[in-house]
Amino acid sequence: MSENRFVSGNVIILYCNFIKLESNKQLPQHIMERIAVCTKIYERIMKSKPDKSDTIINLAAGNDEGSIIKNQLLKNGVEESKIVVVNSYNNIGHLFSVLMNEIKKRPNPPAIYFVSSYQQKDIFDKVTEGYKGYRIQFEGAFDKRPNESIEEDAKKEKLSKRITNIKEKGKNKMVDMLLNYIFPENKRRQSS
């Protein structure tokens, strides 16, 4: 990203993948916490930012859960036109891959707020380390579920080895290029 770009707009990602509704079709408490954090961010933007009209909430959830979460956001005062429910994300890494491909096309990228359980901060950090220069902020919500449930969610979020392999190949190629630049004579001697 070039240095002369400025932030234009806001994208709030409310991450609610892999949730199970309670028996009475109610949202679990940890999702209600995420909705509360999302609503606070939305209200803060609406009260203070000049680019508030260019704000969208990208809700990552399944169809059934997404409609219930959307209704809760509407009850909290969020405009319906600002909410987009997307159920095609496999995990946090996939979400950012798709989102950043769209954002890179914009001349001035938006500020991105990622709302999830605070236990997913390390996954968020790993996923977003490749997007330096963009304003991406983690907003953690409390998650009081048992550790087993949280760890089960984390297993679903594991970054694929494919991403790691691509990074390793890129690093190896850079090292090779650097060594070839530093020691160009070694290659010439070997080929003779």
Residue ranges and their predicted role:
Residues 2-160:
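A structural signal for short, hydrophobic/glycine-enriched beta-strand patches
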Residues 1-3, 191-192:
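Non-Sec secretion/translocation targeting segments of pathogen effectors
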Residues 146-192:
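C-terminal capping/extension of enzyme domains
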